[in-house]
Amino acid sequence: MATFDDVKDVIVDKLGVDGDKVMPEARFVEDLGADSLETVELIMGLEDKFGITISDEDAENIRTVQAAIDYIESKQ
């Protein structure tokens, strides 16, 4: 199962944000300052970390930390 800490580690690594800013309700673009390239890198990082494939359509709907956790848990 995806844990908050595992997802947080990928976010901190890919977006270069302070871990204290990564909360379940945080939005990748608005709250964490991710640009379009960083969001693609984030999705790829989550795919690698959890051994899943995230379609482009699904990736567009993953906008918050909690949405990422929920999606990953639904695929495992």
From Swiss-Prot:
Its biological function?
A: Carrier of the growing fatty acid chain in fatty acid biosynthesis.
Question: Which of UniProt's keywords are assigned here?
Answer: Cytoplasm, Fatty acid biosynthesis, Fatty acid metabolism, Lipid biosynthesis, Lipid metabolism, Phosphopantetheine, Phosphoprotein
Identify the pathway.
Answer: Lipid metabolism; fatty acid biosynthesis
O-(pantetheine 4'-phosphoryl)serine PTM positions read S36
Per the UniProt entry, what are the Gene Ontology biological process annotations, in alphabetical order? lipid A biosynthetic process
Could you tell me which cysteines form disulfide bridges? none
User: What protein name does the entry list?
Assistant: Acyl carrier protein
The question of whether Transcription regulation is a record keyword is answered with no
Single GO cellular component term: cytosol
Record GO terms (molecular function): acyl binding; acyl carrier activity
Pfam families recorded: PP-binding (PF00550)
> How is the polypeptide modified once translated?
4'-phosphopantetheine is transferred from CoA to a specific serine of apo-ACP by AcpS. This modification is essential for activity because fatty acids are bound in thioester linkage to the sulfhydryl of the prosthetic group.
The record's subcellular location field reads: Cytoplasm
Against InterPro entries, the record matches this protein to: ACP, ACP-like_sf, PP-bd_ACP, Ppantetheine_attach_site
Q: Report the residue ranges that make up the Carrier domain in this protein.
A: 1-76
Assigned protein family: Belongs to the acyl carrier protein (ACP) family.
Keyword flag Cytoplasm: yes
